[in-house]
Amino acid sequence: DIDAVDFSMMLASAFEKAGNLLSANMYWPYDMMVEFAEANPEAVRKLFRMLYNENIPLAERYAAFREGFEGYAKPLGKKHYQDLHAISVYLSFEYPEKYFIFKMKIFSIFRKRVGYAVEKTKQQSSVWKVEIYTQMCQLILDEVQKDSELIQMSKNRLDDSCYQDEAYHLLTMDIVFFGGMYM
């Protein structure tokens, strides 16, 4: 709830179960997000409103979000860790039917294993990797939607306490993750 009275507490609670998606060895976007939200909740609320505004191109939202966190972290001699992966987590949690969680290493390995070609151009946006990843995931999703047996298997593994993944984005990300890690 972006309009929550205690925004920093709501934000911490909303992402606390993201686990290793937002915290890992020497990678702390969750901690920095919470720290900044506690210090200046209205600034962070404004950054999330802008990040979630689908009328603004993703590259602009990403740059402005990072700049906002940079303005907080740099004077403290800290890193903000708000990279493409963290942004993709925030967007996927807000719009799970539209976004896929991006992890560069997994994407790179998976695309090489399946022969997904990436054409590099001189005019690439700051989010071109996420855009290419999304295109690849959409191709996978198109195939997933044709496989009724796979869809039923996925539905059977989700109980009432789970997000039901009606758009099959989590299933698609599972395919990419396991294909990148274990194929």
Give residue ranges: language-model regions.
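An N-terminal alpha-helical hairpin/helix-loop-helix interaction module that forms a charged
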Residues: 1-80, 96-183
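Contiguous, well-ordered alpha-helical segments that form the cores/surfaces of helical PPI scaffolds
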Residues: 86-94, 108
